[in-house]
Amino acid sequence: MALLQIAEPGQSSAPHQHRIAIGIDLGTTHSLVATVLSGKPKVLNDVQNRRLLPSIVHYGDNTTHYGEEAKPFIIADPKNTIVSVKRFMGRSKADIKFQHPYELVGSENEMPAFETRAGRKTPVEISAEILKQLKDRAEDSLQNPVNGAVITVPAYFDEAQRQATRDAAQLAGLNVLRLLNEPTAAAVAYGLDQESNLATDRNYVIYDLGGGTFDVSILRFSQGVFEVLATGGHTALGGDDLDRLIVKWAKKQLNIDVLSDEDYAVFIVAARQAKEQLSTQDSVELKLLEATLTLDRPTFESIIQVALDKTISVCKRVLRDAKLELTDIQNVVLVGGSTRSYAVQKAVREVFAQEPLCTINPDEVVAIGASITANQLIGNSQDGSLLLDVTPLSLGLETMGGLVERLISRNTAIPVARRQEFTTYQDGQTAMLIHVVQGERDLVEHCRSLGRFVLHGIPPMTAGQARIEVTFQVDADGLLTVSAREATSGVQAHIDIKPSYGLSEADTERLLIEGFQHAEEDKNLRHLKETKVEAERELESLEQALKVDADLLDEKQLDALNSAKESLKAQLEGSDIQAIEHAVQQLKVHSDAFAALRMNRHIDHALKGTKLDDWSKSN
């Protein structure tokens, strides 16, 4: 929906002035820019009439080459020619386990830099170079400055990867209106809200296999609203991986164990060409070094089957998440250049038992959707359709016992804000550590830590009296802000979650799949932890009370209370929930009597020196 803008008095722009907004598909293999002209989206060409900008940057001694001009250097100068930089965005050096020819510098737990002839370049800087090329292309083509841009990202990009994308856009001089999930952009491009039968809810699968990432989303269109019901994918699975599988096959055919960086670049280029040619041919020849190999369609299918199986597995899981059957899906939309492959189309057709939609160029569909959204956000369009993206993983914080309290569940539509009250655990507690985590498990140790901050200045109170309101807010770009505020004093603190690196493919898979596999185990373990926390709170309160009023008990009462206390402590060493609960009840038998004695003492102190007449006068 269009954002309303309020200008300063006397500074409002001319009525109905058209503002230039662009949509950018910042892809792993190729990038594009589009805009809406005369009500229709259009992909913008460069001066050579080319639409696709290869996402390649070559750093020479005195010159930097981009796109097609950088392509020849993939083989001639691979160490200084950066391709598929999107796969490095927001990821640590330790996370980057796939083969590449680059010299990476930096610590293991930080986003690395590439050592090039032009100096050290970070993935953010290189992405900014690509974005700047697209911005310049748009301004040259439209003969006007760009006022804003919508940039697409994979739905499975986490906070670190999204923030890295925003940083790159800022470095390129772009005003980012929004980061938009690529599958959502595809839905907009296909105008799925414009179909004739809109009386009933309609469900769509967006299958997006690009150069370096895979995403599948299930969208529902209902009463003018697009909602992403569920989403899943891999941050490191795409056409590049299909190329690598072909290279692996070729090495085996030629009995080659290790390739030099230069030879590897030759193999990758040949593999990519073969993959593309097999979309229209039954077989192709690969000229590799001094040998020639023939690759036919059945062999190609068997080579890439392991990757296709991964995508189909994700599709089935996302259907389960959305609580839908195959018969509930009206259309399947193919997005991403890799879906041109006949093998990919065949796999999708067989799983969903229908012909997928691929009438819009799969390389351009995301940029087209982004341009339509940008046109809406800048205020040029009156289209009232609403897009709701979702959080890919649950967000929560750590509570006593190392338990996770979820505030925002997985697949919640964004933007979203959730508030919940928490309290202190100990008497006189003046600070609280807020530990933010991401994942599907019930224990903090099984989730991913996103960040920590401390709320200071909590007034000293009895445990459980303080009221701390914690707010989780995820904006339309999927970026998270967590704030905490103490009610009586008004003290507050917050953190913007910008992790130093993103999730690896293995981490993403672990967080999701283990959540399903260990659901029952986690439920039982959570019950045990909660029972222990309550028992420990009882013991802590009793210890504090005994320090003050132990003289109220005679020797026999004190011995009985201490015996029950030690019995509970012994049970807390084990994991028998019923035994712990029984020990708590036995302790309460004695502690309740002690509490009654304490209450009487405090009432006596309060009434000491007070006459009956004083009560009569007060009433």
From Swiss-Prot:
InterPro entries: ATPase_NBD, Heat_shock_70_CS, HscA_NBD, HSP70_C_sf, HSP70_peptide-bd_sf, Hsp_70_fam, ISC_FeS_clus_asmbl_HscA. Keywords: ATP-binding, Chaperone, Nucleotide-binding, Stress response. HAMAP family: HscA (MF_00679). Chaperone involved in the maturation of iron-sulfur cluster-containing proteins. Has a low intrinsic ATPase activity which is markedly stimulated by HscB. Belongs to the heat shock protein 70 family. Gene3D superfamilies: 1.20.1270.10, 3.30.420.40, Actin, Chain A, domain 4, Substrate Binding Domain Of DNAk, Chain A, domain 1. The gene is hscA. The keyword Signal does not apply. One of its GO terms (biological process) is iron-sulfur cluster assembly. The keyword Chaperone applies. One of its GO terms (molecular function) is ATP hydrolysis activity. This is Chaperone protein HscA homolog. PANTHER family: HEAT SHOCK PROTEIN 70KDA (PTHR19375).
